[in-house]
A protein has these predicted regions:
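Internal intein/HINT superfamily modules and their associated LAGLIDADG
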Residues: 1-220
Length: 220
């Protein structure tokens, strides 16, 4: 009988935790699963987000640079890529796929880590904006927004947030856009933000957190 080959060793420790769930959120928005069934990559303009991704998975790997399609000579993006067949298969098992942009749907995240996942999703593709509405005296408006090119995924997120917070939100899609927007205003946004940033030490993209704090501290 021939010798059995060694079982593959995983680079990533597959165990749910706040940081691990945060990394899954990042991968859902800006990650990529190669069609080779082995390589996983994460791309961002923010080097801090690349560092957060690697920290959350407790790994080190080479960080490269790449350009976008419109300007191939300007390499604005950082890319972290590594090979791990066990982690790759795990990602498939929870709902990620290669070429996921428009096909992604439900992501199987444990309830206790959902808001860590959501914070990663927000840091990857979400936004927060605020302004004073000139139509009304002392009317300070602020919105929390999540986006996805997959209608099924954005509907799943809305359903989960409704179950977990009672927040209804609103889904919209511009006529000339391929992206769905899930938006929460004022009280609903505050409720979700408190759950996303439940301590001052949670792993997050500092510039987004600082923007939120600056806006809300000026009003509340």
């Amino acid at each position: 009988m021939g010798k059995r080959g060694q079982k593959p060793k995983g680079k990533v420790k597959i165990k749910w935790s706040p940081n691990f769930a945060y990394a899954i959120g990042l991968l859902v928005t800006d990650g990529n699963l190669s069609t080779d069934g082995y390589h996983v990559s994460f791309t961002s303009k923010d080097f801090e987000l690349i560092a957060n991704f690697l920290k959350s998975l407790q790994i080190n790997c080479h960080i490269g640079r790449k350009a976008n399609g419109s300007n191939p000579s300007e390499k604005k993006y950082f890319v972290a890529q590594f090979g791990d067949i066990l982690f790759y298969k795990f990602l498939l098992s929870i709902g990620l796929t290669p070429n996921k942009t428009k096909t992604i749907s439900v992501i199987n995240v444990p309830n206790r880590y959902f808001f860590d996942f959501l914070r990663g999703h927000f840091d990857g593709d979400g936004s927060f904006y605020s302004y004073w509405d000139k139509r009304w005296r002392s009317s300070f408006m602020h919105y929390l927004q999540f986006v996805s090119a997959s209608e099924k995924h954005i509907l799943w997120m809305r359903t989960e947030l409704l179950k977990k917070t009672g927040c209804v939100g609103h889904i919209s899609k511009s006529k000339n856009s391929s992206v769905y927007q899930l938006r929460y205003a004022k009280r609903e946004s505050l409720k979700i933000l408190k759950k996303m940033y439940y301590t001052n030490t949670v792993l997050c993209l500092s510039r987004k957190k600082d923007k939120i704090n600056k806006a809300l501290n000026s009003r509340y």
